[in-house]
């Protein structure tokens, strides 16, 4: 099995990249892909850049160039579920766009024409992630993760997301674009991220302060998940 891992930012990939054995770097389309072995398992780790276009471009290049069997999206996210605090883990069962609106033509809010309203994560990957969470004794929530090209740190943006997606557990800027590409390529995916902030008016301050905490937690989760997928 070859496992594809995608993070947007340097801070979100550096801990995993440093552990890759026989590492090679591919620079393509503004993205960097690091290939090699993580604890003996073949992986391809992508640093995509921030936002939906960068994530979709990077995911496409990763899938075409490296042919991974599954995709794990890692990194940080803003917490929406009331039980979440910094460092907690969120696992997607579905991903949706929070900034797409074609409702004038009868689509659901967040749905693009020709696409499902939401992109379902793979059940086996979800189960494997939850097994790792239990093993590591981490606090985690599974549910809907929403994505858009905005960092949510104000009451207006937050209220709009809560109105349109009251069940959403976390918000960030890449996961749904990655899920969209995986859907088109028929490649299983799951989003496993750590909370860096609670999406409120102070979230930009919390993000800067706690990004390293989120990166450490999400990297630990992904490393454990890779081992689980490779060895059971």
Swiss-Prot record:
Q: In which pathway does it act?
A: Amino-acid biosynthesis; L-methionine biosynthesis via salvage pathway; S-methyl-5-thio-alpha-D-ribose 1-phosphate from S-methyl-5'-thioadenosine (hydrolase route): step 1/2
Q: What class of enzyme is it?
A: hydrolase
Tell me the active site: 12, 197
Keywords, sorted A to Z? Amino-acid biosynthesis, Hydrolase, Methionine biosynthesis
Pfam families assigned: PNP_UDP_1
Entry-linked InterPro entries? MTA_SAH_Nsdase, Nucleoside_phosphorylase_d, Nucleoside_phosphorylase_sf
Q: Which residues bind substrate?
A: 78, 152, 173-174
Gene3D superfamilies, per database record: Nucleoside phosphorylase domain
User: Which EC numbers does the record give?
Assistant: 3.2.2.9
This chain belongs to the protein called 5'-methylthioadenosine/S-adenosylhomocysteine nucleosidase
Q: Which family does it belong to?
A: Belongs to the PNP/UDP phosphorylase family. MtnN subfamily.
Subunit details = Homodimer.
What GO molecular function annotations does the UniProt record carry, in alphabetical order?
A: adenosylhomocysteine nucleosidase activity; methylthioadenosine nucleosidase activity
Membrane-crossing residues? none
Offer a single GO CC term for the protein: cytosol
**Record's SUPFAM superfamilies?**
Purine and uridine phosphorylases (SSF53167)
**Described purpose of this protein according to its UniProt entry:** Catalyzes the irreversible cleavage of the glycosidic bond in both 5'-methylthioadenosine (MTA) and S-adenosylhomocysteine (SAH/AdoHcy) to adenine and the corresponding thioribose, 5'-methylthioribose and S-ribosylhomocysteine, respectively. Also cleaves 5'-deoxyadenosine, a toxic by-product of radical S-adenosylmethionine (SAM) enzymes, into 5-deoxyribose and adenine. Thus, is required for in vivo function of the radical SAM enzymes biotin synthase and lipoic acid synthase, that are inhibited by 5'-deoxyadenosine accumulation.
Q: Name one GO biological process term.
A: purine deoxyribonucleoside catabolic process
Which organism is this entry from? Citrobacter koseri (strain ATCC BAA-895 / CDC 4225-83 / SGSC4696)
């Amino acid at each position: 099995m070859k496992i594809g891992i995608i993070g947007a930012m340097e801070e979100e990939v550096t801990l995993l990249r440093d552990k890759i054995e026989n590492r090679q770097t591919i620079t393509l389309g503004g993205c960097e892909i690091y290939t090699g072995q993580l604890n003996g398992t073949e992986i391809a780790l992508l640093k995509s850049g921030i936002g939906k276009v960068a994530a979709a471009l990077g995911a496409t290049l990763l899938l075409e160039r490296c042919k991974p069997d599954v995709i794990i999206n890692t990194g940080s996210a803003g917490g929406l579920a009331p039980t979440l605090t910094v460092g907690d883990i969120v696992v997607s069962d579905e991903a949706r766009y929070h900034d797409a609106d074609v409702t004038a033509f009868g689509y659901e809010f967040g749905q693009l024409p020709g696409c499902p309203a939401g992109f379902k994560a793979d059940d086996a990957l979800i189960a494997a992630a939850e097994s790792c969470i239990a093993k590591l004794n981490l606090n985690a929530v599974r549910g809907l993760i929403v994505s858009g090209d905005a960092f949510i740190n104000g009451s207006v943006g937050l209220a709009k997301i809560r109105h349109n997606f009251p069940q959403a557990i976390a918000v960030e800027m890449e996961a749904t674009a990655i899920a969209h590409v995986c859907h088109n390529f028929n490649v299983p995916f799951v989003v496993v991220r750590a909370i860096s902030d609670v999406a409120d008016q102070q979230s930009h301050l919390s993000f800067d302060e706690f990004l390293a905490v989120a990166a450490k937690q999400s990297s630990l989760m992904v490393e454990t998940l890779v081992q689980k997928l490779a060895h059971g």
